[in-house]
């Protein structure tokens, strides 16, 4: 039986941790002048994905 392919788009966006997956937050690449320093600082951190999305990510990334 052939190997399952990983979803390349998901592989670029999600990293596995001990408790699930983490991802970078959005709204950080452009139009930053109207956003406060506090908002931009909080957006720099990585977030855990929701438990409801975990099964979908695991299915897209079988070997990661």
Curated annotation (Swiss-Prot):
Entry's Gene Ontology BP terms: translation
Any single Pfam family the record assigns to this protein: Ribosomal_L35p
Biased composition (Basic residues): 1-44
Record has Coiled coil as a keyword: no
Disordered, as annotated region: 1-48
Keywords assigned by UniProt, alphabetized: Ribonucleoprotein, Ribosomal protein
Top-rank lineage group of the source organism: Bacteria
KW Zinc (keyword) present: no
PROSITE patterns: RIBOSOMAL_L35
GO molecular function, one term: structural constituent of ribosome
Protein name listed in UniProt: Large ribosomal subunit protein bL35
Underlying gene: rpmI
